[in-house]
Amino acid sequence: MAGSVGLALCGQTLVVRGGSRFLATSIASSDDDSLFIYDCSAAEKKSQENKGEDAPLDQGSGAILASTFSKSGSYFALTDDSKRLILFRTKPWQCLSVRTVARRCTALTFIASEEKVLVADKSGDVYSFSVLEPHGCGRLELGHLSMLLDVAVSPDDRFILTADRDEKIRVSWAAAPHSIESFCLGHTEFVSRISVVPTQPGLLLSSSGDGTLRLWEYRSGRQLHCCHLASLQELVDPQAPQKFAASRIAFWCQENCVALLCDGTPVVYIFQLDARRQQLVYRQQLAFQHQVWDVAFEETQGLWVLQDCQEAPLVLYRPVGDQWQSVPESTVLKKVSGVLRGNWAMLEGSAGADASFSSLYKATFDNVTSYLKKKEERLQQQLEKKQRRRSPPPGPDGHAKKMRPGEATLSC
């Protein structure tokens, strides 16, 4: 999938990416005008160290494919379409290394100890890269027979969780990735996103092209709850496509809330995790007039929404009673929105990038209708042929010749 616009929050640091660039700024105070901008297209390009089937040197544009913070926010990593993994230190911002990867990547995550970053690619492999040795080569950890779409780790770093195009979620032991603890099976389309619940480290959230949000006990592979998004009738726009694949699952520890953003819909779904009953409770739909690019929770402030609107690129939502409501623009929000407006070209240029999941759905072929039609035509032809054989030949006057009982036709 091509690069697209994205939002990431960790602590008081906000990152917005678009195309080959990202910008990082602080949301701690309106007086903090620190701003870090990085352009991957200007980063160093090396010959590929981990050569695979692809060309030795990929001439990509530098478009960012995936990015993430480490747990503490001390590190930030991204991958681009030039097959590079770029690692940053955030306090202060500094590029630590630029390393090559074997394939274009689809997702990445830091392990909880922040010693390694795991990178999943389109060929189904997961590589680990050292953070402590920022120039070290990658190590192959595990592989699928299908494209990987997301990767996560358990809070204790014991398990690596991977989601692929062929409907599977695999739970592997980190110390011995060839040893599989379980599979979480039940999705009927590609698994687009997975997220371990921070407040319940044994639970996993997943979403798929089948239009469901599911809750799992991942070590046993047991499904605890399944929510069909299409069943929430008030959410369905008759003019909108009826396919729901999550492009983002965000979790807010403070309220045990889940925000779900689906690909191609200007809607954010809000659920609440009932840990005692081990189920998801639908709370609210947040509808927008513009395309929503990404969402992220900030623990002390609420839900940040990045949208395709130059006048108001960022919107902040907080729960007020039982309903989520937009917050009047604060000085911090005004400051960050002003920064985005000043760099709007990088976002606007990436808005049309094909980062959707539409190409991942199973191809369906309706060959039954054509088969039945051809079968009916064939039977009709056979019936007409039999009728012609049974009809007696015509006489001299054009009428069928009548034969007497017992009279047989003579043939030469």
Swiss-Prot record:
Pfam families associated with the record: WD40
Phosphoserine, modified sites: S391, S411
Subcellular location: Nucleus; Chromosome
Superkingdom of source: Eukaryota
Modified residues (N-acetylalanine): A2
Principal location class: nucleus
Biological or metabolic pathway of the protein: tRNA modification; N(7)-methylguanine-tRNA biosynthesis
Residue spans of the WD repeats: 3-40, 50-90, 94-131, 137-174, 180-218, 230-273, 319-373
Disease: Galloway-Mowat syndrome 6: A form of Galloway-Mowat syndrome, a severe renal-neurological disease characterized by early-onset nephrotic syndrome associated with microcephaly, central nervous system abnormalities, developmental delays, and a propensity for seizures. Brain anomalies include gyration defects ranging from lissencephaly to pachygyria and polymicrogyria, and cerebellar hypoplasia. Most patients show facial dysmorphism characterized by a small, narrow forehead, large/floppy ears, deep-set eyes, hypertelorism and micrognathia.
Function: Non-catalytic component of the METTL1-WDR4 methyltransferase complex required for the formation of N(7)-methylguanine in a subset of RNA species, such as tRNAs, mRNAs and microRNAs (miRNAs). In the METTL1-WDR4 methyltransferase complex, WDR4 acts as a scaffold for tRNA-binding. Required for the formation of N(7)-methylguanine at position 46 (m7G46) in a large subset of tRNAs that contain the 5'-RAGGU-3' motif within the variable loop. M7G46 interacts with C13-G22 in the D-loop to stabilize tRNA tertiary structure and protect tRNAs from decay.
Family per similarity comment: Belongs to the WD repeat TRM82 family.
Protein name, UniProt field: tRNA (guanine-N(7)-)-methyltransferase non-catalytic subunit WDR4
